[in-house]
Amino acid sequence: MFLLPRFVLVSCIIGSLGFDNPPTNVVSHLNGDWFLFGDSRSDCNHVVNTNPRNYSYMDLNPALCDSGKISSKAGNSIFRSFHFTDFYNYTGEGQQIIFYEGVNFTPYHAFKCTTSGSNDIWMQNKGLFYTQVYKNMAVYRSLTFVNVPYVYNGSAQSTALCKSGSLVLNNPAYIAREANFGDYYYKVEADFYLSGCDEYIVPLCIFNGKFLSNTKYYDDSQYYFNKDTGVIYGLNSTETITTGFDFNCHYLVLPSGNYLAISNELLLTVPTKAICLNKRKDFTPVQVVDSRWNNARQSDNMTAVACQPPYCYFRNSTTNYVGVYDINHGDAGFTSILSGLLYDSPCFSQQGVFRYDNVSSVWPLYPYGRCPTAADINNPDVPICVYDPLPLILLGILLGVAVIIIVVLLLYFMVDNGTRLHDA
């Protein structure tokens, strides 16, 4: 009880000396159990293979290159590897997961399945995909890719229907129409299998619009049926538009099992790759660094849309990306954000990372870790410390209860002692 005024006094003295402990705009970790997924801006192998070895190409401090805690690939992203033939097997595990990738699939690439398609739909797909990845990596330690085997009993093969520039979609796969079918009004099925992981992220996609082929319009219809549990997942085309639509994808989180892919109209699609989620962990928010181009190229904000508290903290620079190696590699602002990976930090919040766990002038929003006591520390001529009143109220209640108990005990013993003297 007598220590409280001293604590407040010491805190005020600290405040008068300028101690503030604000949240910092970095990504960091509580301890050594962390992992980063990235692209060329954190791809140490890419830099090693350039001549000369110019580490200004990266936003990552080269001291982390031998940490064994980075899975990055120049020119790629997790979304790009998930859907397209341009594939890198991102693999990593940690309690605290950080993502700094996504820029290698943006409006700059202008991808769309057909000439009359829509890149806006693919940006929507990107946002939905990363939402599932971020949410699930807050509760899983391990991420990697796995192939999804499937069995189709017809003679038709998969076809590269959806492609643009150098990007060719191969997940999900399109099964071409059988030669004996005169149109796309038919039902067809394929078996596929998920095994070896705790859960999987798989795509379920349709053309949401009137798909034209040989003067006929078709409504896409795709389903996945879990033959072990009887659960069915499905999408049907609901739009009446004939141009400006594209491949709308939902990203399902499925358990291991035997599945049936079913198409009631148009082409059958079946997943060929999945994100493999393994090793459940205590809830730990992921951290995402904005992945964007210099303003000379068009970027998107889909990773920011996907990264929402409480499962995700988003970090961004307030200025244009201007690299020192070239305009898209080696930006000082993003290098500063990644510098937090060089040290441990006790507390994470929506506003940033706190370097100390004692007091702060900022109340941590969606805090995780050992976070500072809320305090508003000011520095006028006479320092004033205004602390969060809740702990003081609770302390007062506890002290009041303790006083009542002591008084009751004293009265009890006094009455009991008086009774004994009277009896004597």
UniProtKB/Swiss-Prot annotation:
Residues 17-392 are virion surface. One of its GO terms (biological process) is fusion of virus membrane with host plasma membrane. The keyword Transmembrane helix applies. This is Hemagglutinin-esterase. The active site is at S40, D326, H329. It holds the Pfam family Hema_esterase. One of its GO terms (cellular component) is virion membrane. It is found in: Virion membrane; Host cell membrane. Keywords: Disulfide bond, Glycoprotein, Hemagglutinin, Host cell membrane, Host membrane, Hydrolase, Membrane, Signal, Transmembrane, Transmembrane helix, Viral envelope protein, Virion. Structural protein that makes short spikes at the surface of the virus. Contains receptor binding and receptor-destroying activities. Mediates de-O-acetylation of N-acetyl-4-O-acetylneuraminic acid, which is probably the receptor determinant recognized by the virus on the surface of erythrocytes and susceptible cells. This receptor-destroying activity is important for virus release as it probably helps preventing self-aggregation and ensures the efficient spread of the progeny virus from cell to cell. It catalyses: N-acetyl-9-O-acetylneuraminate + H2O = N-acetylneuraminate + acetate + H(+); N-acetyl-4-O-acetylneuraminate + H2O = N-acetylneuraminate + acetate + H(+). Glycans are attached at N54, N89, N153, N236, N301, N316, N358, N417. Residues 128-266 are annotated as: Receptor binding. Residues 1-16 form the signal peptide. It is an enzyme of class 3 (hydrolase). Homodimer; disulfide-linked. Forms a complex with the M protein in the pre-Golgi. Associates then with S-M complex to form a ternary complex S-M-HE. It comes from the Viruses. Its main location: virion. N-glycosylated in the host RER. InterPro entries: Capsid_hemagglutn, HEMA, Hemagglutn-estrase_core, Hemagglutn-estrase_hemagglutn. Disulfide bonds join C44-C65, C113-C162, C197-C276, C205-C249, C307-C312, C347-C371. The gene is HE.
